[in-house]
Design a protein with these regions (language model features):
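N-terminal glycine-rich FAD/FM-binding segment characteristic of electron-transfer flavoproteins
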Residues: 1-169
C-alpha cells in the first residue's frame, strides 16, 4: 500500500509498545564502508505528503521551476513535479508525484504545464480541488480538473502571482 492512498484509521485497543531488538552483524557486513555521500536538495515549501496546497510543474514549464516556485511561495505550497520534469533534471527526484513518486492528497492541486498522463494522475487521486494550466486544450489533465486555463504558463502564472499580491495588499 502506498502512502496517501487511504485515510488513516483511528487506533483502537491498548497502546502498543516497542522493544529493542539486537541484530547480529556478520563480519562481511561489518566490512562495508561509506565511500561517498551526496547531499540532495529538497523541493521548497512544506513536505509533499502533508501539504494542503501543491503546485506541480510538468513538461510545459520547460525547466523553469523558478516560475513554479513563484506561484507556490505566496500560497505556502509545496512544489512537486511530474516524472518528465525529474527525468530531465529540472528538479530533484524527491519532488516527483505519481506511480513512481509520491502519492498526495492536498486540498488544492495546481498543475502547471502538466499533461495529465496516468502515471502522474494516479498520484493525485486524493486531491480536493484540481486546477490545470496547460497550453494543450486536449490534455487529459482537463478531464479531472475542477478549473482549467488553456494558455501558456509563462504568461498565465505571472498574472496569477501579480493578482495574489494585489489581493494580499
Amino acid at each position: 500500500m502506498r502512502p496517501g492512498i487511504a485515510a488513516v484509521a483511528a487506533a483502537e485497543g491498548a497502546p502498543l509498545t516497542a522493544e529493542p531488538l539486537e541484530v547480529p552483524v556478520s563480519a562481511e557486513a561489518a566490512a562495508v564502508r561509506l565511500v561517498s555521500r551526496e547531499a540532495t536538495s529538497v523541493a521548497s515549501g512544506p513536505a509533499l505528503s502533508e501539504a494542503r496546497t501543491v503546485v506541480v510543474g510538468g513538461r510545459g514549464v520547460d525547466g523553469d521551476f523558478d516560475l513554479v516556485r513563484s506561484l507556490a511561495q505566496p500560497l505556502d505550497a509545496a512544489v512537486g513535479a511530474t516524472r518528465v520534469a525529474c527525468d530531465e533534471g529540472w528538479i530533484e527526484r524527491s519532488a516527483q508525484i505519481g506511480q513512481t513518486g509520491e502519492t498526495i492528497s492536498p486540498r488544492l492541486y495546481i498543475g502547471l504545464g502538466v499533461s495529465g498522463a496516468v502515471h502522474h494522475t494516479s498520484g493525485i487521486q486524493g486531491a480536493g480541488t484540481v486546477v490545470a494550466i496547460c497550453d494543450d486544450s486536449e490534455a487529459p489533465i482537463f478531464e479531472m480538473a475542477d478549473f482549467g486555463v488553456v494558455g501558456d504558463v509563462t504568461e498565465v502564472v505571472p498574472q496569477l502571482v501579480e493578482e495574489l499580491a494585489r489581493l494580499r495588499g
